[in-house]
Each structure stands twice: as structure tokens, then as C-alpha cells.
Amino acid sequence: ISKEKALQVTLKNSIDNLSTYYSHPRFYTEYFYDKYGEEFTKKLLKANNEKPPFTIRVNTLKINRDELIKNLTESGFDIEETTYVNALNVLNPNGIIDTEFFEKGHFYVQDLGSILVSTFLNPSKDSKVLDLCAAPGGKTTHLSELMDNTGEIIACDKSKGKIKLIKENA
């Protein structure tokens, strides 16, 4: 490549431009472009490339949210509250799983989407729940927490190796 001339690539259309610029498959880009238009698709593709927050779920069977926030803040972690009661974002998560609070099971590292699955299901005490694709166990333990460790949860996963993870996290 010449230092004097910048490399220019001409793409066929907006779908190709967006797909290349945001590093998404063409079929994915085309689907949203055709259904929702260029501006929505740009926003969606850009959002897909953003780094998600580091989220933890408070284990309310062992500690309340405010106490965990206080403990983690005093330990030097910057905590951002979310609109969801027992989900917190940790802005500087390095070393958080080495804390006594993690060791004692006061929180579980879990993506907000997974937290919301259990939250929206909203099982009551003594419920019976079938958790498919349960590994590594975050949703399973959250369901148990929401059920106050009562009821029955059947946790399944197609991978035998992943079943071990569920047991370790229980």
C-alpha cells in the first residue's frame, strides 16, 4: 500500500457498508435494514459492538443489596445501581471474585439478561421449575433464591461436562 494514496474500498450499497463497518454478517444487517431501515440498523449494530457492563446478582438469601453495595464500596469497588433490584454493575471489577464477599456467596457474576429471565418468570415458594440449558448454573441458583430454597428445580444441560458446573455453583 502506498503511503501517498489511501486505500479506498467501494462497497455495493448501504447494507454492505454497514455490515463491513460494524463487523456483522451481511444476512443479519440486511434483515434489520429491510425491516427497520438504515438509522435503526446503524444504532443496533453499534450497540451490539459495545462492551456490556460487568454485572453481579445479589444473593438475597445471604445479604441485602444495600449492605453488599456498602461492603464492596468500602473494599474499593465502584458500584453502579441498576433499575433491577438485585443487579449491580461493577465499574472496576478486577479482583472482585477474590473478595470474601464472593467466597461467602454474597453475589454471583451474571449477565443482566440471564438475571431477567428468572426475574420475569417470578417463581413462588414451592414452585416446580424445569431449567433447560442450565449450565453454568446462574439462572438455576437465582430461581432457587427467588423460591427461598423451596420447591423443585430440574436443571438440565446437553453437555455432561457442564452439568458439573451447575453442581459447583449450587
Model-derived regions: residue spans:
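S-adenosylmethionine
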Residues: I1-A170
